């Protein structure tokens, strides 16, 4: 390796903290500050390094002029071209400034939900149920295997940091982010996050690992009225049930398992007392009591604290406003918000790309270089732990692994084995809520009416027919939500009422009067199924499944072993009367947490 930062070389046998400090000491102040930023970028093929991005400056400016070395990947090219594009950016980073390589991160990419601020629909990698579906299966070995699959796919693509797992508890039924959690039970989530981190990072963080960013500390989920804190109307996080500590349980497990990084949530705690002290009502990342006092000192976390994205600067993205999520400090200027974040104990600013803000604070004497060095050292240490400074290509991927990845199916980085595992897990996660005797499994020869399922998914023996010719119907519906589209990302968030529109209910009831109906509901949130549960012949929940996986579960080709990872409320009135911070506390739920019609409500 060449460059003022990395030469003369420091022996890999030297203590990793000493190596990190030595490298930081060799860097200019501007290069150190560049490490403290983690913006999102869009990457095409071929990569256009000189074109301005919809999110800000060109890639060349970010890498060369601003010295940024951590990037979250938003839109990317087809997987066959990702590696080449990222290698081009690595070469640019290696030729300038600190010569440190880039750490590319990503939101989840292995499931169904496409939300540019939270997750990406699987494309070229194996497709699994949403994490809530893994929570429904409840198999630690499978979750560990899933982590290993994600690790292999990311490494093959050149991605070395995951902005997941999300281990918030699904305690407010209306909240939009439940599908990416493991469910409402604290201990269950803790077991699964341990297994996931073992798969993603390995026993110890090292050259074979993907660095995990566990989120959203100290637990999203207790949102007032279930509204999402990406938006001003959802900024308040409340604890009327006094269950703050429940939400820490999975984070304690993640810290014990060695998570590389932790991301605080956007939410602003309201009326929260902790150990006899009133917690300041500002967004979690701005809160020194919770980041330094709780996370660093009480819980002993010494990894990277990466803020959630967009806490400092207002933005307009694709023509939609996206105000900074600076809840409780909206009155502060961007530079004052940056100072608050570093005072709180944050190491890196997610979604921000302007190091001049920190450089100005240094010039003013409002942040000293020792504070910058502490965070920069953590970020260099992470690169060292991942082996990025010990590989000639700077991303820690062995050639053999890259060659193996090229052997996947056409258009896929994943192996056929991984693809099959993901599809099978989609079926396994499905949860039978009710079934009349003799309905399931569906037989091999049927005249069936399919609604919102592709006819191509039907088995060879089925005749897909119009309703008047059918002996049974299989219907898919998604969980209800209220469409909104004022702010960027708002249209991607399923929020509001969990009750189905009467036209949906009436349509299913009318069909059920003519023939038995097997109703499959995608439970991205805990839908109110009370008007339908006694009407249909079988009621089944899925947590992210393709049509073929749905049919495989309904025909018994794969056994649907899922149990509800959250309860299904009986009514919206019951939801409104519940406490947002308390797991599974709606009055007289239609189905309790852990329920399956094939085994009651006791999780095995």
What are these regions (language model features)?
Residues 1-18, 55, 156, 285, ...:
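C-terminal non-catalytic regions of proteins with extracellular/luminal or membrane-system context
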Residues 2-216, 248-263, 281-351, 367-388, ...:
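N-terminal beta-rich core of secreted/periplasmic extracellular enzymes
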Residues 116-117, 226-227, 272-278, 282, ...:
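Histidine/acidic-residue-rich catalytic or RNA/ligand-binding cores of hydrolases
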Residues 126-128, 177-180, 227-235, 319-323, ...:
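Short glycine/proline- and charge-enriched loop/turn segments
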Residues 220:
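Glycine-rich phosphate/diphosphate-binding loop of Rossmann-like nucleotide-binding domains
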Residues 224-246:
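Binuclear metal-dependent hydrolase catalytic cores centered on His/Asp/Glu-rich metal-binding motifs
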Residues 265-272:
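Extended catalytic-interface subdomain
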Residues 377, 384-409:
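Conserved, charged catalytic cores of large soluble enzymes
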């Amino acid at each position: 390796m060449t460059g003022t930062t990395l030469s003369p070389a420091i022996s890999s046998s030297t203590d990793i903290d000493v190596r990190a400090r030595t490298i930081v000491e060799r860097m200019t102040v501007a290069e150190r500050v560049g490490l403290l930023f983690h913006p999102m970028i869009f990457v095409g093929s071929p990569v256009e390094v000189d074109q301005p991005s919809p999110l800000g400056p060109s890639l060349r400016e970010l890498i060369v002029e601003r010295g940024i070395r951590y990037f979250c990947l938003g839109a990317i090219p087809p997987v066959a071209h990702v590696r080449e594009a990222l290698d081009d950016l690595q070469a640019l980073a290696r030729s300038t400034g600190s010569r440190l390589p880039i750490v590319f991160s990503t939101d989840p990419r292995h499931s169904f939900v496409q939300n540019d601020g939270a997750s990406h629909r699987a494309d070229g990698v194996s497709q699994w149920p949403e994490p809530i579906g893994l929570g429904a299966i409840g198999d630690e070995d499978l979750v560990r295997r899933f982590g290993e699959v994600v690790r292999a796919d990311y490494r093959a693509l050149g991605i070395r940091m995951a902005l997941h797992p999300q281990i918030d508890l699904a305690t407010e039924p209306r909240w939009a982010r439940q599908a990416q959690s493991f469910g409402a039970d604290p201990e269950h989530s803790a077991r699964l996050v341990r297994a996931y981190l073992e798969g993603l990072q390995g026993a110890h963080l090292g050259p074979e690992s993907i660095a995990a960013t566990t989120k959203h500390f100290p637990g999203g989920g207790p949102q007032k009225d279930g509204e999402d804190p990406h938006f001003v109307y959802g900024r308040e996080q409340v604890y009327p049930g006094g269950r703050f500590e429940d939400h820490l349980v999975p984070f304690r497990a993640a810290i014990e398992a060695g998570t590389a990084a932790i991301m605080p949530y956007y939410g602003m705690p309201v009326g929260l007392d902790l150990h006899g002290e009133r917690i300041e009502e500002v967004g979690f990342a701005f809160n020194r009591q919770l980041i330094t006092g709780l996370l660093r000192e009480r819980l002993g976390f010494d990894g990277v604290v990466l803020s959630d994205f967009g806490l400092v600067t207002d933005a307009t993205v694709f023509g939609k406003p996206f105000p900074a999520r600076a809840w409780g400090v909206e009155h502060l200027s961007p530079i004052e918000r940056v100072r608050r974040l570093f005072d709180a104990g944050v190491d890196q600013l997610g979604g921000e790309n302007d190091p001049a803000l920190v450089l100005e604070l240094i010039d003013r004497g409002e942040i000293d270089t020792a504070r910058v060095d502490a965070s920069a050292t953590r970020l260099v240490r992470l690169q060292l732990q991942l082996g990025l400074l010990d590989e000639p290509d700077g991303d820690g991927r062995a050639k053999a692994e890259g060659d193996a990845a090229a052997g996947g199916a056409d258009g896929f980085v994943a192996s056929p084995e991984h693809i099959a595992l993901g599809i099978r897990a989609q079926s396994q996660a499905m949860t039978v809520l009710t079934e009349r005797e003799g309905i399931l499994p569906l037989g091999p020869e049927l005249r069936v009416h399919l609604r919102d399922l592709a006819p191509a998914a039907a088995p060879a023996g089925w005749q897909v027919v119009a309703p008047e010719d059918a002996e049974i119907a299989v219907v898919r519906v998604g969980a209800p939500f209220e469409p909104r589209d004022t702010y960027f990302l708002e249209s991607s968030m399923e929020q509001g009422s969990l009750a189905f529109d009467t036209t949906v209910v009436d349509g299913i009831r009318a069909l059920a009067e003519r023939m038995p109906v097997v109703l499959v509901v995608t439970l991205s949130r805990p839908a109110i199924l009370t008007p339908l549960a006694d009407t249909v012949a079988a009621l089944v929940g899925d947590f992210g499944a393709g049509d073929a996986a749905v049919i495989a579960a309904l025909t018994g080709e794969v056994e649907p072993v899922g149990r509800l990872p959250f309860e299904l409320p009986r009514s919206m009135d019951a939801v409104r009367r519940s406490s947002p911070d308390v797991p599974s506390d709606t009055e007289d739920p239609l189905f309790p947490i852990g329920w399956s019609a094939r085994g009651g409500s006791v999780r095995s």
